[in-house]
Amino acid sequence: VHYELTRKIAEGGMGLVYEATQKGIGGFRKVVAIKLIREEYSAIEEFRNNFIGEAKLVADLIHTNIVQTYHLGKIGEQYFMTMEFVTGWNLEEFLDRHVETEQYIPADLAVFIVSRICRGLGYAHRKKDSQGRLLGIVHRDVNPKNIMIAQEGDVKLTDFGIAKALDLMYNKEGDVIAGKDEYLS
């Protein structure tokens, strides 16, 4: 199996996300998203541990309203995660498009989008580990950029990078408030 990067689709302070083609034997091909830690952060143990923690945390979150993670890998010193590719828009792009065209989003569509995100969050929060212990996953960064709307109408939550689930992730609890100011509550 190898990956061919097609184009950059998102960029954040600590990482990049690319559309890519996964290639395998017999002409197998699948479009995926690949999330990379920025090279300058790959050398920092805390960032590596958090990236690996995110992959472990979301590996078993299999729900229609959560972007699925397929694989955690490393090439040289560069860590990457392969994820489901969603053909569509993030909610911020969707909202911006409606503002540009001076159109309102119908109330029933807004309720539908929020209800699907709540389903994904509820599933993550109720998820149990292999011993039946509640993980209590809290996303901590729900915002329009982390909500995908597929062309087919599916709504999916992505980027569990600062999520917290008991002690699965490396985290200096109490040292930092995680999330974006506009969306903290």
Label every model-predicted segment:
Residues 16:
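Conserved N-lobe ATP-binding subsite of Hanks-type protein kinase domains
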Residues 38-60:
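AlphaC helix of the eukaryotic protein kinase fold
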Residues 72:
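Activation-segment/catalytic-loop signature of the eukaryotic protein kinase fold
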Residues 76-90, 94:
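Conserved short submotifs of the Hanks-type protein kinase catalytic core
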Residues 91-105:
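AlphaC helix of the protein kinase catalytic domain
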Residues 113-114:
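Activation segment signature within eukaryotic-like protein kinase domains
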Residues 119-137:
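Protein kinase catalytic-loop region centered on the HRD/HxD motif
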